[in-house]
Amino acid sequence: AAHFQPDLFLVDKKPNGLQGELQATLDYLKYHHPQTRYVLLLRDILDSAPATIAQWQRENYYFLAESRYDQVWIVGSPEIFNAVEEYRFSPTLKAKTQFMGYIRRPPGLQSPQAIRQKLGITEKDRFILVTPGGGKDGFCLVDTYLQAQTQCFSDQKIISLIVGGSEMPLAQKHDLLARIRPVSHWHWLEFTPDLASYMAAADLVVSMGGYNTVSEILSLQKRAVVVPRIEPVAEQWIRAQRLAEGGVLRMLHPQQLTPQRLATVMSEELTASPRVASDYTLDFNALPRITEAFLRLLEQEDSFKELLQPIAV
């Protein structure tokens, strides 16, 4: 901070850092670089209201957000989850909080046709993408999916790509690979930097409920069955529940996850009509709004105003 002397300091999720490590930096900048502007960036949902309120009171986050930050930006929509009301923001904190909408994910690097050709998928085949995020706790979802395919879709050739995640424990990965490899229409990737391309090519996505994955699903207007994580925080569960109530995806509670139940919901989604733009009323304008908000904040700084002046050519 002393070296960079930032004009704007953007902090993600926790006002003083993951383990309080930003407190000293915030204190330093306050006294040695008072012109720095501060923005706290929050996801649409942090945790349940009782858990979040208790944590913010315990960690003094309300005071920090009110006293140290110029603005709070929430990358979500109040129609889905009104964090300002749910988390009981004070009038002072409400006044500096803005909902930016959801982040529209960029398109993939490969066309759906190229992906389907790569995986040997014909026009008549159905293609399901399974993605349990990083994979650390994704074994149950993938295991149940494979059981559903074996028990309930044995008479159908459904092309499946499982992107297991680089954090899946080695023993669990080996267990899954031993079952996937003998089946010609089942495919495995541990990780891909181009998940959006595979998602765009899929007829259905089966996933957990993390912010990035759900944003990709909604950006691409894909039919999806989401099995959210319910612990240690309720973020994914609340997100999936609210979106399911809005009719933009299907949700299964992990305690209700069985091969038969998953197969039933997948069958219903595979036979439903494709998603169309009119099905979605979600706001996906976070990136342009954030860009505008950055410029508005920085235009107040003399050093930045000089950079914005037109250059004679």
What are these regions (language model features)?
Residues 264-313:
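C-terminal amphipathic helix plus adjacent low-complexity
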Residues 104-204, 255:
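Donor-nucleotide binding loops and adjacent catalytic segments primarily
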Residues 2-66:
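Conserved nucleotide-sugar donor-interacting segment of glycosyltransferase catalytic cores
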Residues 32-37, 69, 94-95, 158, ...:
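A short helix->loop->beta-strand "cap" motif at the edges of active sites that frequently abuts
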Residues 42-139, 165:
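A nucleotide-sugar donor-handling region in carbohydrate enzymes
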Residues 193-238:
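A donor-sugar binding/catalytic signature common to diverse glycosyltransferases
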Residues 98-101, 189-190, 250-258:
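Short acidic-hydrophobic, aromatic-tinged amphipathic segments that line or gate anion-handling sites
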